[in-house]
């Protein structure tokens, strides 16, 4: 830090050209930086979709075999089609 006894105009002679310059009593501290925002993933909600077709589902229960198949098809407002098939 600068020595408080030395006038600032000695260190910076061009400041003496200003008539109304006065040395501030102390520096204003810099504000604390904000934490960066965490990126959030946008969830696709049901009302974001134009149509949802979940009619094609099948359940088979045999004595030696059990399976579940779920087929979902959705079309977005932009016309993109998404198909999800889940087989268990």
UniProtKB/Swiss-Prot annotation:
Pfam families registered for this protein in UniProt: Pap_E4 (PF02711)
List the InterPro entries hit by this protein, alphabetically: Papilloma_E4
Keywords linked to the UniProt accession: Early protein, Host cytoplasm, Host G2/M cell cycle arrest by virus, Host nucleus, Host-virus interaction, Modulation of host cell cycle by virus, Phosphoprotein
Give the record's PTM text.
Phosphorylated by host ERK. The phosphorylation triggers a structural change that enhances keratin binding and protein stability.
Localisation per UniProt entry: Host cytoplasm; Host nucleus
Q: Name one GO biological process term.
A: symbiont-mediated arrest of host cell cycle during G2/M transition
Recorded GO CC terms? host cell cytoplasm; host cell nucleus
Q: Report further notes.
A: The major E4 form is first synthesized as an E1^E4 fusion protein from spliced E1^E4 transcripts, such that the first few amino acids of the E4 protein are derived from the N terminus of E1.
The record's similarity note reads: Belongs to the papillomaviridae E4 protein family.
Q: What does this protein do?
A: Contributes to multiple aspects of the viral life cycle including viral genome amplification, suppression of suprabasal cell differentiation and egress of newly formed virions. Induces host cell cycle arrest at the G2 phase by associating with and preventing the nuclear entry of host CDK1/cyclin B1 complexes. Inhibits cellular DNA replication by preventing loading of host replication licensing proteins MCM2 and MCM7 onto chromatin. Within the cytoplasm, associates with host kinase SRPK1, a splicing factor regulator, and inhibits its activity.
Query: What interactions and quaternary structure are annotated?
Result: Assembles into oligomeric complexes. Interacts with host CDK1. Interacts with host SRPK1; this interaction may favor expression of late viral transcripts. Interacts with host cytokeratin components KRT8 and KRT18.
- Name of this chain's protein: Protein E4
What gene does this protein come from? E4
């Amino acid at each position: 830090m600068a020595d408080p006894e030395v006038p600032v105009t000695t260190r910076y002679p061009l400041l003496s050209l200003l008539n109304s310059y006065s040395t501030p009593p102390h520096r204003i501290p810099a504000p604390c930086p904000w934490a960066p925002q965490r990126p959030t993933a946008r969830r696709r909600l049901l009302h974001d979709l134009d149509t949802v077709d979940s009619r094609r589902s099948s359940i088979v229960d045999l004595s030696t075999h059990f399976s579940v198949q779920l087929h979902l098809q959705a079309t977005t407002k932009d016309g993109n089609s998404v198909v999800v098939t889940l087989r268990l």
